[in-house]
Structures are given as structure tokens and as C-alpha cells.
Amino acid sequence: MEIKNGLCTQKYTKVYAEDKEKWKFNAPHHFIVGKADCEDEYIEPIEYVNFQEGPIKEYGINGVNNEDLILMVITRLQAFQDSPYKCRENAMAITKLQECLMWLGKRTLDREVKGIEGTSEI
């Protein structure tokens, strides 16, 4: 299925994920970034992104996690900030992405305190 968001342009690329009925653990795990000028049934992949499927303690490490991708984007934007391409918008995006990491880290810490981090327990 194609992933759409009103805040993202799809002028050059489109993002796809498996259909909802194929989701495991309540979320999509497999994404394709494809060229926007292709028909949906003929996606020309640029890159594949596979997220962790299931808790690590139960399934081992089998994909990237949210924090990995956020860290990549922060690193990329920070490199632009250290160049002539520095701008307010990049600085704001970095701040918000760092905030994302903080909240995801808090979720992890809360689960560690409960003794359920890395498991499917709620």
C-alpha cells in the first residue's frame, strides 16, 4: 500500500508498506521507497527498509528500529548545518527529532522499570 501524508511531497519518491492485513505486531515492518514516476503496480525500488519484527528478546535482532532511522536523519541534517546549507528549518527539525528520541527513550526506560523491555508484555 502507498503511504501518503499531506506534509510530504511525492514529487520524486513514494513510500510503500505491506498491506494492513499482512502486518505483524500491529504495525507495518517492510517499506519500499520507489520512484514517483512509476505506476503503483510497477514500483521501481530505490531502497528497502525492514523494521524489527517482534520483541528482540523473543525474536532476536531482525531489522532496524525507529531510533536508528531518526538518528540517521539527525546526522544528515546536522551535516547540512555544519555546511553552507545551514538554515533555521534544519535546526528546528533536528530539535524535534531529538525530542522524538527522548520520548522513545522514555518509553524504553518505563518498560525497563517494569521488567518488560524487549518482550511482548504490556
Curated annotation (Swiss-Prot):
Although 2'cADPR has been crystallized with Tad1 (AC P0DW58) we have chosen to show 3'cADPR binding here, as evidence suggests 3'cADPR is produced by ThsB2 (AC J8CSK2) and 3'cADPR activates ThsA better than 2'cADPR (AC J8G6Z1). Encoded in a prophage region of this genome. InterPro entries: Acb2/Tad1_hairpin. Upon ligand binding the C-terminus changes conformation, enclosing the ligand. Changing residue 90 to A: No longer binds 2'cADPR, partial loss of anti-phage defense activity. Belongs to the Tad1 family. 3'cADPR binds at residues 52, 54, 76, 80, 85, 90, 107, 111, 118. Keywords: Nucleotide-binding. The gene is tad1. Homodimer. Blocks activity of the Thoeris antiviral defense system (ThsA and ThsB). Binds and sequesters the cyclic ADP-D-ribose signal molecule (cADPR) generated by ThsB (AC J8G8J6), ThsB' (AC J8CSK2, probably 3'cADPR), BdTIR (AC I1GTC2, 2'cADPR) and AaTIR (AC A0A1H7VGH3, 3'cADPR). Sequestration prevents the signal from activating the Thoeris antiviral defense system; heating cmTad1 bound to the signal (95 degrees Celsius for 15 minutes) restores the ability of the signal to activate the NAD(+) hydrolase activity of ThsA (AC J8G6Z1). One of its GO terms (molecular function) is nucleotide binding. Pfam families: Acb2_Tad1_hairpin. This is Thoeris anti-defense 1.
